[in-house]
Amino acid sequence: MLRETAPRETRVALTPEGVRTLSTAGLRVVVEAGAGQGAGFADAAYRASGAVVADRATVFERAGIVVWVKPPAYELDSLPLRAGTTLVGFQDPHYRRHEIDRLRARGIESVAFDRVPRDETTTEIDALTTMSRIAGGVGYAEGRRLLSPSRRTGPVRALVLGCGAAGLAAIAAARTFDDEKPTAVGNRLAQRDAAFEAGAGRFVPNRDDNAALLESLATTTPDLVVCTAVHRGSPAPRLLDQKALDLLGPGAVVVDLVAKAGGNCVATVADRTATLPNGVVVTHRSNYPASRPEPASHAYGAAAAAMVLRIARGTADVP
């Protein structure tokens, strides 16, 4: 397991608990020194769980399966990776396609959590869903904090775009603040039950022309909009245009969790918080789960350990 080197990354790919799971299954685990520091896990805890703690070069020399959270910030092409090695983690396949192809030509395979399908057979290895849940809750809380004082004098009124894992978590987060039950916007009526179960007070089935969304904004103006609408591997739909933003009014906040996929909001700029001329604040930052490093590492680590076991047993079947 590698120490994370991506900017502001605090998570770790395996917790000591995950190492113990793999060690108990008969696998030998090598952990890069300091890997768990950002999430609060000391090297001694990994040793106590059965791991060998070593430097980066030793990890690559000894490991047949290498796990990370995010791709390393250094060039893998320059490292002495052995043919037959499998790299497990988020791979950013859209942006790293050429590097992944070069590694494959050397006999090094990349297993991407980004592309694990979401169904009943993949629940234990679906790291993307678990991270999305954390991002939804964090995004709601951070957006709420950015509201103007006048918008926080009473229960906050929120609108959540998208009813996937992140959207449902954002809806549920409203209850922890005793806010109004959010309005949920989805593109399928089948999402309605899940939205209400999470705590939504209203469900708006939106169509491609966004007419239903615009009508909702005009009749029930929210203080906070949390954007989560995206399909895995696809560009995010553009749901908030300038007309929609003008309906929100000064002091409202838009949190766009899907900026990396293009964003749901026309004014979103990745890793930036900006106040628009109309007074609406639009914000995004990379890696919302990293602000909750310990629970995020436990969730990610459980998926990573399960994936490593599947690979070791020859039962993994993901891109």
Task: Describe these PLM feature segments.
Residues 1-102:
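An N-terminal-biased, well-structured beta-alpha scaffold segment characteristic
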Residues 2-36, 145-227:
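Glycine-rich phosphate/diphosphate-binding loop of Rossmann-like nucleotide-binding domains
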Residues 3-5, 74-157, 287:
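Glycine/serine-rich phosphate-binding loop and adjoining beta1-alpha1 elements at the start
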Residues 19, 43, 100, 140, ...:
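Generic hydrophobic/aromatic pocket-lining and core-packing "Φ" positions
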Residues 50-57, 111, 202-209:
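Short acidic-hydrophobic, aromatic-tinged amphipathic segments that line or gate anion-handling sites
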Residues 68-94, 215-254:
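Rossmann-fold NAD(P) dinucleotide-binding segment
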Residues 93-119, 235-288:
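Rossmann-fold NAD(P)-binding glycine/threonine-rich loop
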Residues 114-153, 259-319:
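Adenosine-phosphate binding glycine-rich loop
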